[in-house]
């Protein structure tokens, strides 16, 4: 695990799975109401600069996709460990620039900064944020979205 939080999640997962439960690992759920997105939009709309990590990957999901999957797990009375993720990663800087363009703001207001492990509570910067969904795609007949599709769905 890359952080204390991740270590605690792993321990919790073991307890749940050892008791016949269900664990669904999610990557990052994003919406227009996500605090970071709202903050960036407000600042960019006010012609103010924002900082975005250029070395930190994100694997965005939208809430509708997550809810659809949870319903399928319930309907099949499934047990065990499942993962939800888009097919590909995107960097925070790319989301910020995309948002700037979407709201007709100046992309030059987006500053590229490097995430430092200590500042984000990690032991190291992860190379990838995606999770393998091969089993979930087969077992539940779902299509893993691309990050671009997720961002389009949430209006970014």
Q: What are these model-predicted stretches?
A:
Residues 5, 22-24, 82, 111:
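Hydrophobic/aromatic beta-strand patches that form the interior of the parallel beta-sheet core
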Residues 8:
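Active-site helix of classical SDR
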Residues 91-97, 113-156:
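Conserved C-terminal active-site "lid" loop/helix of NAD(P)H-dependent oxidoreductases
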């Amino acid at each position: 695990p890359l952080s204390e939080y991740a270590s605690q999640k792993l321990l919790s997962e073991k307890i749940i799975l050892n008791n016949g439960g269900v664990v669904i690992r999610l990557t990052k759920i994003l919406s227009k109401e996500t605090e970071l997105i709202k903050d960036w939009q407000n600042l960019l709309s006010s012609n103010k600069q924002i900082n975005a990590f250029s070395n930190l990957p994100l694997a965005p999901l939208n809430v509708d996709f997550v809810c659809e999957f949870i319903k399928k797990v319930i309907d099949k009375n499934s047990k065990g460990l499942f993962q939800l993720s888009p097919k590909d990663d995107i960097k925070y800087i790319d989301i910020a620039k995309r948002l700037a363009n979407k709201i007709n703001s100046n992309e030059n207001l987006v500053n590229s900064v490097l995430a430092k492990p200590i500042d984000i509570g990690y032991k190291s910067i992860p190379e990838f944020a995606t999770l393998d969904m091969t089993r979930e795609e087969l077992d539940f007949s779902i299509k893993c979205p691309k990050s671009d599709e997720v961002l389009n769905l949430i209006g970014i």
